[in-house]
Amino acid sequence: MKNAVICLLLFGICLTVSAQEKVETVSMRYETQNDMPLFYQKLKESLTYPMAWGNSSIRNFEKWREEARKVLLDCMQPAPPVAAFDKEVIDIERREGYTVEKILFNVSEYSRVPAYLLVPEGKGPFPAVLLLHDHGAHFSIGKEKMVRPFGVEASVTADADDWAERCYDKQYVGDYLASHGYVVLAVDALFWGERGRKEGVRYDSQQALAANMLQMGMSWGALIVWDDIRSAEFLATLPMVSKDRIGTMGFSMGAHRAWMVSAATDVVKAGAAVCWMNTTDSLMTLTNNQNKGGSAYSMIIPGIRNWMDYPHVASIACPKPMLFINGLRDKLFPVKGVESAFSTMQDVWKGQSVENLLTTKFYDLPHFC
């Protein structure tokens, strides 16, 4: 009897251990890694980009360009309702060779936005640049990254000076352009500067903002592009601006904005994009910064990857003059992906016999190039 009891106890212990092993085995199952689904490679392989030039059945380039832009704008819907710009000058400062106006204008019915408008001395009309600020995970300033601020608290000026030193070789790009004869418009994107959080800067809130907007049918990334389109259209209404010479430029997220708005509207005649071009295949990996969410939402257009990749969208800008620069030591944008994207765009411009209007350059520099 004693032996039977011992056997039963041992059998029970074995069952318990076996059950624990099964629980542990089950608990080790997973289907995401580094916030990517394990099937992410299959997702990438499924992307055939049917609207890309060369993949599309449309063989007339102008017709393709029209239809590809329509697809892009459809993916960006809904567009914010349009309102009269109703420009208002609220402050002005004269600088050497140009003036800086702090203005307000309606970028949509939803938003009346502050901006800096820089106007060269002399008789216009002048060429103009829509100058688009970066992301930088630095939200306390936006337009002030591009234009030396005035009429602000000392802390804002110090913040802007520090950013110009860190990212722009101590140069306010907007002031440089204005001193060389360009009208410049710099506007905060939603979530930056004077369009930021009432509660104060918080990195994680950009993901919450994006999710909340998606739940109400709108994309944060698309809204930024719509605002940039309207900002370009606003520039074109100004009497001192030569409407046939409106360009755009930006660094990092500003570069993404630059080629996006160049693709989205022909109000923009030329663009320069510094340090933001790649392919989905190279960016969507287990180790790239793009898979962290958060900041990526500011540049996501829902559904567009089912139609076109980044260089395909940028190619809608063809035959405009475009400049793309990337760094060989840029850890955010793998060189292999940049090379592939550059090659895709070069084929498009060359195919339209305007290869001289596309410049793609690498510099042996990191992201801040």
Residue ranges and their predicted role:
Residues A19-T99, V107, G142:
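N-terminal targeting or regulatory segments adjacent to alpha/beta-hydrolase or S9 domains
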Residues G250-G254, A258:
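Gly/Ala-rich beta-loop-alpha elbow adjacent to hydrolase catalytic centers
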Residues Y110-V113, P120-A128, H135-H138:
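Proline/glycine-enriched tight loop/beta-turn segments at coil->beta junctions
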Residues A317, F324-N326:
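Short beta-strand/loop motif that positions the catalytic acidic residue
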Residues S343-C369:
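C-terminal catalytic histidine-bearing segment of alpha/beta-hydrolase fold enzymes
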Residues M240-G250:
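Alpha/beta-hydrolase fold nucleophile elbow
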Residues G124, L132-W226, A236-T237, L283-T285:
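Cap/lid segment of the alpha/beta-hydrolase catalytic domain
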Residues N212-Q215, L223, R230, A270-A314, ...:
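Mobile cap/lid helix-loop segments that gate and shape the active-site cleft of serine hydrolases
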